[in-house]
């Protein structure tokens, strides 16, 4: 988060170090953090554009199937102690041909970044931001006209992917 104020409040779920530290402090094996990620990503993918509490509930139900070897209480503790998203979707713009979608994502400190989903016949390509602003100064790019404000942390980058996943799944329903 170079150049930015430290994050406050509940930690972001997609911060791998915080999540692993949390599960180990609660007496779980560190691998539980990876399993939590898997069930939450699955819940996001399967649920589409649902509210965060519904994603946590679905993730909790996935513990029951036994394949994840994840204690249900681990999901409950994570849902109480982490924000699923510290960022939020501020704006969505669809291209006329509906093959490209730009998402404006507002970070917890109020800064905004852009992510883009480009749909092709056999795949979807995603472009995510790793910084707020840019030092290059390219006049054709909105981000390039801003000064470099700071770097995103890993969880903010991963949240962009998760928010795009959530949006694309809801869009395809």
Each model region followed by its residue ranges:
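Flexible, acidic/Gly-rich N-terminal and inter-domain linker regions that tether
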Residues: 1-124
């Amino acid at each position: 988060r170079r150049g930015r104020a430290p994050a406050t409040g509940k930690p972001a779920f997609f911060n791998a170090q915080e999540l692993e530290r949390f599960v180990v402090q609660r007496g779980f094996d560190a691998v539980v953090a990876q399993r939590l990620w898997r069930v939450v990503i699955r819940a996001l993918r399967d649920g589409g554009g649902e509210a965060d509490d519904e994603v946590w509930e679905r993730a909790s139900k996935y513990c029951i199937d036994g394949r994840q070897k994840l204690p249900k209480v681990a999901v409950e503790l994570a849902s109480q102690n982490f924000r699923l998203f510290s960022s939020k979707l501020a704006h969505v713009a669809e291209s006329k041909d509906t093959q490209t979608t730009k998402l404006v994502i507002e970070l917890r400190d109020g800064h905004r970044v852009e992510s883009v989903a480009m749909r092709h016949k056999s795949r979807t390509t995603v472009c995510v931001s790793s910084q707020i602003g840019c030092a290059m100064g390219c006049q054709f790019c909105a981000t390039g006209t801003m000064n470099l404000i700071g770097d995103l942390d890993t969880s903010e980058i991963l949240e962009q992917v998760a928010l795009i996943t959530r949006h694309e799944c809801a869009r395809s329903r």
